[in-house]
């Protein structure tokens, strides 16, 4: 039988617990998880092809070098620890510039310059073929690679219709003059690619700011402002307005990958 003294001690402890335990009310504000925050966003990039072409033509005319890297590529390499080796064939390319002509040169003989990078597809084939699930797509559309899981099988490189992935035949650190500590270093024997500067995105979202990838920042500071980045789930964002007001092209859209790099004003459209 419980003594009177023990009964009073137990009831007193229970009362104290009721007083000290915080009560959850309808007004309680819950902090959103990173996944919930990301689901509210879908990041994408838009390219003004006319401005990009003008930038490259002026750089080539000034330097005489058709392989010159424009400000966007230089900034991307520096920001993301992309190495440069003596033998160009070993260089990873997160962003590169391609020259192209339209299908009917007799109608429009003009040549255009466009940036090529990871398209962060809605249905990324690289993710589908990855043996170790190292390649994955976040709720906000960013396609990433977990370097700790990548075994360098290169199936993703074969599956990518945009040639956006590179294999590290050499330790990247051997081709770097300086290192950005904010970006993870890769190793020899793994695949890497553009991340839309995901470290900048996550930091900006935490602060309630608009993220700006390094290439976009450099394009507006040193180039022609051809690149625009933003959240296409926000109808008031600059990129949403561009997509509404222009005829845009997605590379190899017929493959059903739904790429999220959009090219505007290609062919004077």
Swiss-Prot record:
Membrane topology: Peripheral membrane protein
UniProt main location, coarse: membrane
The 4Fe-4S ferredoxin-type domain, residue ranges: 141-170
Positions with a binding annotation for [4Fe-4S] cluster 1: 52, 55, 72, 219
PROSITE patterns assigned: 4FE4S_FER_1, 4FE4S_FER_2, TAT
The keyword Membrane belongs to this UniProt entry's keyword annotation: yes
UniProt: [4Fe-4S] cluster 3 binding residues: 118, 121, 126, 160
Residue positions binding [4Fe-4S] cluster 4: 130, 150, 153, 156
Gene3D superfamilies, sorted: 3.30.70.20
Keywords: 4Fe-4S, Cell membrane, Electron transport, Iron, Iron-sulfur, Membrane, Metal-binding, Oxidoreductase, Signal, Transport
Subcellular location as annotated: Cell membrane
A single MF term (Gene Ontology): oxidoreductase activity
Free-text comment on the cofactor: Binds 4 [4Fe-4S] clusters.
Reported cofactor(s): [4Fe-4S] cluster
Residues the entry annotates as binding [4Fe-4S] cluster 2: 76, 194, 197, 215
A GO-annotated cellular component: plasma membrane
InterPro entries: 4Fe4S_Fe-S-bd (IPR017896), 4Fe4S_Fe_S_CS (IPR017900), DsrO-like (IPR054822), ET_IronSulfur_Cluster-Binding (IPR050954), TAT_signal (IPR006311)
Signal peptide: 1-26
Post-translational modification: Predicted to be exported by the Tat system. The position of the signal peptide cleavage has been experimentally proven.
Subunit structure: Consists of five subunits: an integral membrane subunit, a cytochrome b-like subunit, a cytochrome c subunit and two iron-sulfur subunits.
Listed NCBIfam families: DsrO (NF045797)
Annotated function: Has menaquinol-oxidizing activity. HmeA, HmeB and HmeE subunits may together catalyze electron transfer from menaquinol to cytochrome c.
Protein name (Swiss-Prot/TrEMBL): Hdr-like menaquinol oxidoreductase iron-sulfur subunit 1
Taxon lineage: Archaea, Methanobacteriati, Methanobacteriota, Archaeoglobi, Archaeoglobales
């Amino acid at each position: 039988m419980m003594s009177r003294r023990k009964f009073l001690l137990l009831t007193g402890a229970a009362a104290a617990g009721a007083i000290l335990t915080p009560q959850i009310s309808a007004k309680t504000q819950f902090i959103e998880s990173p996944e919930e925050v990301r689901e509210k966003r879908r990041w994408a990039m838009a390219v003004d092809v006319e401005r990009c072409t003008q930038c490259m033509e002026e750089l080539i005319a000034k330097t005489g070098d058709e392989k010159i890297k424009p400000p966007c590529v230089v900034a991307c390499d520096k920001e993301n620890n992309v190495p440069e080796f003596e033998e160009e064939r070993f260089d990873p390319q997160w962003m590169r510039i391609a020259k192209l002509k339209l299908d009917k040169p007799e109608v429009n003989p003009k040549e255009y310059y466009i940036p090529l990078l990871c398209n962060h597809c809605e249905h990324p084939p690289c993710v589908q073929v990855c043996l170790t699930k190292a390649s994955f797509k976040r709720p906000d559309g960013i396609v990433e690679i977990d370097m700790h899981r990548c075994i360098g099988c290169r199936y993703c490189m074969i599956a990518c219709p945009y040639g956006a992935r590179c294999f590290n035949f050499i330790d990247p650190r051997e081709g770097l003059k300086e290192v950005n500590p904010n970006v993870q270093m890769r190793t020899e024997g793994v695949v890497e690619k553009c991340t839309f500067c995901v470290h900048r995105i996550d930091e900006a979202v935490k602060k309630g700011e608009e993220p700006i990838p390094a290439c976009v920042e450099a394009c507006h500071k040193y180039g022609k402002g051809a690149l625009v980045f933003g959240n296409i789930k926000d109808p008031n964002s600059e990129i949403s307005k561009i997509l509404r007001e222009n005829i845009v092209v997605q590379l190899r859209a017929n493959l059903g990958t739904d790429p999220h790099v959009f090219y505007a004003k290609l062919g004077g459209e």
